[in-house]
Amino acid sequence: MADIGIDQKDPYFVAVKVFLEDGGKLFIFKDKFGAWDLPGGRIKKHEFQTPLHDIVKRKMSEEVGDVLQYTVETMPSVLMRHERVESVPGNPTVHIFGLGYRATRAGGEVVLSDAHTEMKWVDVNEFKPEEYFTGGWLDGVREYLKLIKK
């Protein structure tokens, strides 16, 4: 087999995403750039050795506050690949590999961060994700909805 150089590899960021449910409803929110999203985000360089559940807790705390109580499954339910244009000088396109974790709200309320402008709890049986999501995140939400409706 031929040796494939590093220039043939596709570098990915890695993100954790949380499918937060409460009584048949899924939590989604809109970021300050107008894109709908799930709680979560990219793993930071210094977190390479950090357990994924600790990263999930950090991202949930940053994005939905510390008042919300929830339980998270130990293994990802959905794997996603997403491409996005960054809102930084040069607007580079980046690839993100996402691990989607199922979570259940146990109490408390969502307190949105300053990075988010709107939130919704959508009925999983009536939700049309294509009206909110695009690309790999849309594929991941569709996969998740199929999984929970089995």
Write out the residue ranges for each language-model feature.
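Acidic, metal-coordinating catalytic segment for phosphate/diphosphate chemistry
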Residues: 1-19, 23, 90-91
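Short connector loops at helix/strand junctions that flank enzyme active sites
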Residues: 13, 33, 38, 92-98
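Short, well-ordered beta-strand micro-motif
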Residues: 20, 100-104, 121-123
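Conserved Nudix-box catalytic region and its N-terminal flanking loop in Nudix hydrolases
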Residues: 24-66
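Short helix-loop capping/hinge motifs at secondary-structure junctions, enriched
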Residues: 26, 108-112
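Nudix hydrolase/Nudix homology domain
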Residues: 34-36, 111-150
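Active-site segment of metal-dependent pyrophosphate-handling enzymes
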Residues: 65-109
